[in-house]
Amino acid sequence: MKIEAVIFDWAGTTVDYGCFAPLEVFMKIFHKRGVEITAEEARKPMGLLKIDHVRALTEMPRIADEWKRVFGQLPTEADIHEMYEEFAEILFSILPSYATPIDGVKEVIASLRERGIKIGSTTGYTREMMEIVVKEAVLQGYKPDFLVTPDDVPAGRPYPWMCYKNAMELGVYPMNHMIKVGDTVSDMKEGRNAGMWTVGVILGSSELGLTEEEVESMDSVELREKIEIVRNRFVENGAHFTIETMQELENVMEHIEKQELIIS
């Protein structure tokens, strides 16, 4: 079996180490309404279309209870749309600062292209948001062959439609000749639902939720424990393989090709 294409996520996978751009914005829009949410709660739905992310936060039992305590009722669709519009406005203003490619990504992409591998991408950001991210990422040397956003298909993650559209545009089939790489639970589900080899990247991921400085300064035993927690979470949600850094991806690819593995 030959791998012909790799589909990458963006924030937390190829750019924005730790996926911090949306995090504080989610926390801020709830705080403004007197409802405090934790960073862990804000990260849990990461990878979804952002309005779906806001909706998922309002459906978490603790947050829903706190909202009801403050407002006397559960959040409505009008509340969700109002918060999303506010989220988007703030995010647009900060996105240019969160499009830096993660160390090693550009080199891995170049190596894959030397092998004739096509590079696709999916995201939880809207097309309008991605226009900002792509523009900045290109200036810094990262540009996949194709991008699909949730705006381009009937539904975003965990549905497989963004991966299918990548496959059509890149001209690659069957789906098990492609690898999906991401940093969230919804990425793992997207890849598996699409019938692709699915790989979770840990360092720099939203699931790990650490800055580069925190990773470098953390006690090695504590860091290893956190890495293993994320690794297990990825596997439990469908990852065929996990890698700590993007530099390990080609080893995974060679393993799949040499062993003639079959997706199960």
Swiss-Prot record:
Its EC number is 3.11.1.1. One of its GO terms (molecular function) is phosphoglycolate phosphatase activity. The active site is at residues 9, 50. Its cofactor is Mg(2+). Mg(2+) binds at residues 9, 11, 183. Involved in phosphonate degradation. Belongs to the HAD-like hydrolase superfamily. PhnX family. Homodimer. This is Phosphonoacetaldehyde hydrolase. The gene is phnX.
